[in-house]
Amino acid sequence: MYKRQDKEIEPVRKKLKHLIVNVSNLKTVFPDIRIRIGQGNTHSSYMGITDSFREAELAIMNRMGENEDTYICYSEDSKSGKTKEEIFDSGLRNEILTYQERMDIEGTLRLVDKVGEKLKPFKYDGKLVYEVFGELVETLRFGMKYSREGRNLFLIEDYKKQYRRIWDYDELFQWIKSDLSRVHQVYMKNIQDEESKPI
């Protein structure tokens, strides 16, 4: 937002909050509607408008752990100072790949939980959550090198789309685990079908 006077911006904020209330009231008719509005900082010139849009996008990324139907203002405090490598290090990555190579789905799911637990204290940092989630998906996909079908069912683009749809941190990790189990079941069924074919 262009910084003219904070007094002039306040009515805009009030109208946005009023919009959220109105949309929330529609939930009785449309129960699947969810809305979050991100607001960037005010800036002293028109040149800052792009920065304000970027900050608004980052505010929306920080939606994990917020209540639904929330108006989220960008804040520098939402940065945890952690890197994705600190949460999802090479040791953890290699462990996941080892379990996948053994086709040990239970071990793989436990390690996905481990990543989720390590990241959970920093779920307010949307950029970090997105980066770690992306790295986890890339690793799981790489671990499916043994399965062309698995790689075709586990597409990065689908995960990025689904990430944008999910609003809750626990739901995010629950979803990736259930999808990973689904892909594993399809793969195991294909193996059984191949083995049962007459020679």
Where are these regions (language model features)?
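Cytosolic nucleotide-utilizing catalytic cores of signal-transduction proteins
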Residues: 3-199
